[in-house]
């Protein structure tokens, strides 16, 4: 039986999974907009530039370097992964502490939206999990095992949606007001789930 080149199969798998996650994300955003409203969704979107900067500082370049090093020397991949995790977390944890501690200042002075202050602590807690997830994905990309990063995306998206639905159900049952913080907790839980999935595989 003819086997396809790993680049082709990997690309097809990532494309299919990416498309599936986009569809899930599309319906998830519709649900969020109806649950927390347009204003809440806007506040949720406003915190992502800060999240993107934190990711770029603690994970982005490290993920790329790890992928290249692992591809060049697969037998040293595990050692590269351990070093990358240590380096990434050594940056991610102080960033988490800074964002958590100075949430009010960052919301008012950087994001120019004081209403975002309650969202930043939960966002900050997701950063170490993002770092772990990124490093693990870089490692598996280097080994040309794209199935793990692909399915970690599915795990993240599904757990995020399920957790948000569960929180909404609990809030409705107990008559607790639903706020935009719901979406950020969903993000945190999804990132944690994908990080744990990658570490356990």
Task: List the predicted regions and their residue ranges.
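Small-residue-rich midsections of specific transmembrane alpha-helices
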Residues: 45-69, 125-128
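Hydrophobic alpha-helical transmembrane segments
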Residues: 152-166, 174-201
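Membrane-interface junctions at transmembrane-helix termini in multi-pass inner-membrane proteins
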Residues: 130-152
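N-terminal membrane topogenesis motif
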Residues: 1-24
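Interfacial/gating helices of multi-pass transporter permease domains
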Residues: 32-52, 115-117, 179-184
């Amino acid at each position: 039986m003819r086997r396809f080149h790993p680049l082709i199969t990997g690309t097809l798998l990532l494309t299919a999974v990416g498309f599936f996650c986009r569809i899930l994300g599309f319906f998830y955003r519709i649900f969020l907009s109806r649950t927390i409203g347009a204003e809440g969704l806007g506040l949720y979107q406003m915190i992502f530039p800060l999240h993107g900067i934190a990711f770029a500082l603690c994970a982005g370049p490290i993920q790329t370097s790890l992928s290249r090093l692992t591809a060049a020397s697969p037998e040293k991949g595990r050692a590269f992964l351990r070093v990358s995790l240590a380096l990434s977390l050594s940056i991610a944890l102080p960033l988490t502490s800074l964002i958590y501690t100075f949430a009010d200042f960052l919301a008012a002075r950087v994001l120019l939206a004081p209403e975002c202050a309650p969202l930043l602590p939960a966002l900050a807690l997701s950063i170490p999990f993002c770092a772990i997830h990124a490093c693990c994905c870089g490692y598996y990309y280097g080994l040309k095992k794209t199935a793990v990063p692909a399915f970690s995306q599915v795990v993240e998206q599904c757990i995020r949606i399920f957790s948000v639905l569960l929180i909404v159900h609990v809030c409705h049952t107990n008559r607790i007001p639903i706020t935009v913080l719901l979406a950020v907790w969903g993000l945190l839980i999804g990132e944690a789930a994908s990080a744990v999935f990658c570490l356990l595989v």
